C-alpha cells in the first residue's frame, strides 16, 4: 500500500493506516481508560515532520445547538453488531446527541470495541453499526489489552492545527479501499466520557487522524468526500462495486452514486484555529 513521500522515513507503525491497522501497539501518553477522562492524549511515535499541504479547503463550522437528543430506543442494539457498508443511507443520516449515560451505553461501547477488534479496525463510530447517535470508540493499537481504549460521546472540535497532512486512509464501511486524505495534524476536542463527565483533550498525529475520521462519520461525511478528484478516480470502480453490491443485497437502487458526485468542499477542520 503506497503512502505519500513525506512519510517514507517514518517508523513502520506510522505507515500503517486507519482504520484497518496491523496489531501493533503505539505508546500513548496519559492513563485514559473507558471510564476516565484526561486533558491530554497524543501519540509519542517519532516521525519526520510532515510537509504543509497546499490543498485549499473550506472551513466547515459546526453548531450542534439544534441537535436532537437520542431516546432510549435510539441506543437499543442487538449483538453481534454488524458493520454498515457504503452506500447505506444510515451513513449519511443525522446523528443524535446522547444524554442518557447508563448500563446500556456501557454495553454498547463494549460491543463496539468487540466488533472493531474482530474486523481489524482501530476506530469505529455508532452510525457504522447502525445507530445514529454521537458516539465513537478507538484504540490506535488495534488490539484488546494493548494501547488505550478511547470513548468519546457528543464530541465537538474546538481548534485544529494549520498544518495539513496527507495520509492514506481505509474505512471499515469501505472494505479493502484505501486512498489519500488530507487532514489537520492536531485537534482540540470537547466531549463527554462514558459516565457523562465533560472534558477536553488534545490529539495529534495518528490519534488525531483516527478521531477526525470517526468524527466525520458523526457528521454524515465519508472519507471520499475529502479526496481530490484525482484520488477519487483511483478508487471509483471499487466504490461503484459497493453500490452494485448494495443494490443486489437490498433490491433497492443505490441511494447515492459516485459517478454523479460533484466535488464536495468538505472542511478539513472545525471550530477555531
From Swiss-Prot:
Fe cation binds at residues 171, 213, 217. Expressed in leaves and flowers. Inhibited by actinonin. It is found in: Plastid, Chloroplast stroma; Mitochondrion. Homodimer. Its cofactor is Fe(2+). Disulfide bonds: none annotated. Residues 1-56 form a transit peptide. It comes from the Eukaryota. Binds 1 Fe(2+) ion. The keyword Transit peptide applies. This is Peptide deformylase 1B, chloroplastic/mitochondrial. GO terms for molecular function: metal ion binding; peptide deformylase activity. Residues 262-273 have a biased composition (Basic residues). It catalyses: N-terminal N-formyl-L-methionyl-[peptide] + H2O = N-terminal L-methionyl-[peptide] + formate. Keywords: Chloroplast, Hydrolase, Iron, Metal-binding, Mitochondrion, Plastid, Protein biosynthesis, Transit peptide. Residues 246-261 have a biased composition (Basic and acidic residues). Disruption phenotype: Albino. Removes the formyl group from the N-terminal Met of newly synthesized proteins. Has a preferred substrate specificity towards the photosystem II (PS II) D1 polypeptide. One of its GO terms (biological process) is translation. InterPro entries: Peptide_deformylase, Peptide_deformylase_sf. Belongs to the polypeptide deformylase family. It holds the Pfam family Pep_deformylase. CDD domains: Pep_deformylase.
